[in-house]
Amino acid sequence: MGLSSTDKKDRRNMLFAAIPSICASSPKKISIYNEEMIVARCFIGFLIFSRKSLGKTFKETLDGRIESIQEELQQFFNPKQVIPGESNEQQRLLRISLRICSAVVESLPTAACAPKCEKTVQALLCRNLNVKSATLLNATSSRRIRLQDDIVTGFHFSVSERFVSGSTFKASTVEQIREAFVPIDLIREGLIVLRKV
């Protein structure tokens, strides 16, 4: 019985793997078996003997992955493609189960309490909104009072600084009056802004 071409290649590879161990010899023609040579021969032998089985396994895995990727790409580029019968059946069963679930939920005793719960939730939300709006109004009114106090204090300070007797600041009376009206304009603008708020 003759050897196939792959068997011949395997034997040739084994011969090439054995050559380094034969060549690695001492001057006295004694073969040296160090750890590196043993590891190298074991690795080469593993590659030779496992090439067939591992190659087939990797090839089958890669072929399956390639096919699944191609199917996904076809579905991605052709979304209007006809859906197989199995998926139609699954969708039909899903619709039926959803109908059953909704019927079961509606028949539960808690479903009868849903309108009352809805009214209670609405009442709570309205109460919370009223509390927050009242708090906001109180905060804005207190800020308005504080802003008016700050503006009046600044106005008194700037006017008293300008008109205090013995002031070294030399400016005309018209300029001093104009500068005194600036805080009044600020008060008006602040009140307008606060009314808008």
UniProtKB/Swiss-Prot annotation:
This is ATP synthase protein MI25. GO terms for cellular component: mitochondrial membrane; mitochondrion; proton-transporting ATP synthase complex. It is a single-pass membrane protein. It is found in: Mitochondrion membrane. This is one of the chains of the nonenzymatic component (CF(0) subunit) of the mitochondrial ATPase complex. It holds the Pfam family Mt_ATP-synt_B. It comes from Oryza sativa subsp. indica (Rice). Belongs to the ATPase protein MI25 family.
